[in-house]
Design a protein with these regions (language model features):
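Core helices of alpha-solenoid repeat scaffolds
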Residues: 4-20, 58-70, 134-149, 161-164, ...
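HEAT-repeat alpha-solenoid elements in large eukaryotic scaffold proteins
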Residues: 32-53, 99-102, 107-126, 172-190, ...
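Extended helix-rich, non-globular scaffold segments
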Residues: 149, 154-158, 178, 251, ...
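Short coil/turn segments at helix-helix junctions and helix-capping linkers
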Residues: 3-6, 25-33, 85-93, 133, ...
Length: 442
C-alpha cells in the first residue's frame, strides 16, 4: 500500500472511532413488528483498528472500506429529516459527527487520489475542476453504490406475478426495513449533488428513484419523491432524456398516494411536469396530471391537509398551462367556492391567492362563474370579520374584485350592483370607484 493510501486508511479509522463510540451508547429502538436493527446494520460498515495491522490490506480493500463508511454516514446523516421509528432513535450529535467525518474524508481523498478521482469524474462527463472538492468522492462512488441501493429497495417490492397477499409476500422475502434504510441513503446521495452536476448523473439516479416510487411502502415512496423534487430543481428537461414520459407516468400513478405523502407527490408532480412540458401548455401530461389531482380533491374536499398541500404547490402548473386553464374551470371553481369558506385561515388565504393567479392568467373570459365568484367574495369579505387573518383576507378579496372589475367591466358592475348598498361592504366601494375612474381615463 502506498504512503498516501496508508495515511488515508489511518484517517478513516480515526474518523470512524467517535462515530462507533456514539453508536454503541445510543439506545436503538427496534420498531414493533420488524426484526431489522439499524444499529446492527451500521456497525459492520464502520472500520476498526486492527492490531496488528493486516499486511495484506490493499487499495481495493481500502476502497471497499471507504464505500461502506460512506453508506454509514449517508444513513446517519439522512436520519436528521426522519420521524420514522427505524431512524428516529439516532441522536443529532451522531448525525452531525457523520456529516463532519464524511466532509473530512472527502477532502483527504480528493488530495490523495486526485488522478483516479479526475478519471472517474471524466468518465461521467464531469469537469473535475468545476466539482467542489467535498463532492468528488461522492460522485465517484455513485456508479457503484446506486445500483446496490436500487437492488436493496427492489428486494421487498411487490412481485406482480404472485397471487397471494402481495405486501405480505414481499415483506416475507426481505424485511422492508432494509429497503427503507436504502431509500434514505439513496435520497441523501442524490441531494448532495446540485446543478449543474446532477444532470450528468441522470442515467444513474433516475432508475433508482423510479424503483423507490414503485415500492408499496409510503416511507420509501416518500424518499423517491424527495429525490425527484431535488432532481427537478437541479437539472434541465433535456438532461432527463427519454426518461421524461416514464417519470411523468410514475407521478400520475402516485397521485393516489395516502395523506402522509400527498404533499410530496403534488410538489414532485408539479415540478416535473412544469420542468418537462413548459413549452407546451396543451401537453396531455398537464391535462392528465391536473385531472388526476382534481379527482382526488373532489372525493375528499374537506381534507385540510390535501387541499392545503395542493393549493400551496399548484401555482407553477397553473402558470404552465395559462389560458388552457379555462377548460378546467368547471372542476376548479366548485372546489374554490367551497374552500373560500373553510374554517382555517390558511386554506382561505391560499385559495384567494390562486383565484388571483387564475384571473391574471385567463382574464376569466368566456365563463359562467363571474357572478358566483363576486357573490362568494362579498360573502367572504363579511365572514372575515370573525377570522384572525381579517386584514389579509379582506385585502386579497379587494384585489380580486379590482381585477374582476378591470377584466369584466360592465358585466362586473351589473353583478356588483346587488352588493353596492350593503353597509357591510361599504369599505370596498372606494377601491372599486378608483378602478372605474382608471378605466374611464384609459
Amino acid at each position: 500500500m502506498s504512503e498516501s493510501s496508508s495515511t488515508l486508511c489511518e484517517l478513516l479509522i480515526q474518523l470512524s472511532e467517535p462515530i462507533s463510540e456514539y453508536l454503541s451508547k445510543a439506545q436503538c429502538t427496534q420498531p414493533e413488528g420488524t426484526n431489522v436493527s439499524l444499529k446492527a446494520l451500521l456497525e459492520p460498515l464502520l472500520p476498526h483498528k486492527q492490531s496488528p495491522p493486516s499486511p495484506n490490506f490493499n487499495d481495493t480493500q481500502l476502497h471497499s472500506s471507504i464505500r461502506d463508511f460512506t453508506f454509514a454516514c449517508a444513513l446517519l446523516s439522512s436520519s436528521q429529516s426522519s420521524v420514522h421509528d427505524l431512524l428516529s432513535w439516532i441522536p443529532k450529535h451522531l448525525s452531525a459527527a457523520a456529516d463532519l467525518a464524511f466532509l473530512k474524508l472527502s477532502k483527504a481523498y480528493s488530495m490523495a487520489y486526485s488522478k483516479r478521482n479526475n478519471e472517474k469524474l471524466s468518465e461521467l462527463g464531469l469537469n473535475y475542476g468545476s466539482v467542489p472538492e467535498e463532492k468528488r468522492l461522492l460522485i465517484e462512488l455513485m456508479p457503484e453504490v446506486l445500483p446496490l441501493l436500487k437492488n436493496r429497495i427492489k428486494e421487498s417490492s411487490i412481485d406482480k406475478s404472485e397471487d397471494c397477499d402481495e405486501v405480505s409476500a414481499a415483506s416475507a422475502r426481505v424485511p422492508v426495513g432494509f429497503a427503507i434504510a436504502a431509500a434514505y441513503q439513496f435520497r441523501w446521495f442524490v441531494t448532495q449533488i446540485d446543478y449543474p452536476h446532477l444532470g450528468k448523473l441522470s442515467a444513474l439516479v433516475i432508475p433508482c428513484a423510479l424503483t423507490a416510487l414503485d415500492h408499496w411502502s409510503p416511507e420509501i415512496k416518500g424518499q423517491g419523491m424527495l429525490s425527484f423534487i431535488h432532481i427537478a430543481k437541479n437539472v434541465y428537461a433535456a438532461e432527463l432524456g427519454w426518461y421524461q414520459d416514464v417519470i411523468l407516468d410514475a407521478c400520475c400513478q402516485n397521485i393516489a398516494s395516502g395523506d402522509e405523502i400527498w404533499h410530496l407527490v403534488v410538489e414532485m408532480s408539479v415540478l416535473i411536469v412544469t420542468c418537462t412540458q413548459q413549452s407546451n401548455p396543451r401537453s396531455a401530461w398537464f391535462d392528465r396530471m391536473l385531472n388526476e389531482m382534481l379527482s382526488h380533491l373532489e372525493r375528499q374536499p374537506r381534507n385540510k391537509e390535501r387541499r392545503v398541500a395542493w393549493l400551496r404547490h399548484i401555482e407553477p402548473l397553473f402558470n404552465g398551462v395559462g389560458l388552457v386553464l379555462l377548460a378546467h374551470f368547471r372542476r376548479i371553481f366548485p372546489l374554490f367556492f367551497q374552500w373560500m369558506h373553510a374554517d382555517d385561515d390558511e386554506t382561505v388565504l391560499l385559495v384567494l391567492k390562486q383565484i388571483e393567479t387564475i384571473i391574471k392568467l385567463t382574464w376569466i373570459r368566456n365563463t359562467q362563474y363571474v357572478e358566483r365568484l363576486v357573490d362568494e367574495l362579498a360573502a367572504l369579505y363579511k365572514e372575515a370579520a370573525l377570522k384572525r387573518s381579517l386584514e389579509e383576507i379582506r385585502n386579497l378579496v379587494i384585489r380580486i374584485l379590482i381585477l374582476l372589475h378591470q377584466c369584466k367591466g360592465l358585466q362586473f358592475e351589473t353583478v356588483w350592483g346587488k352588493h353596492r348598498d350593503d353597509p357591510n361592504l361599504a369599505s370596498i366601494v372606494p377601491s372599486l370607484g378608483e378602478t372605474k375612474t382608471t378605466r374611464v381615463a384609459q
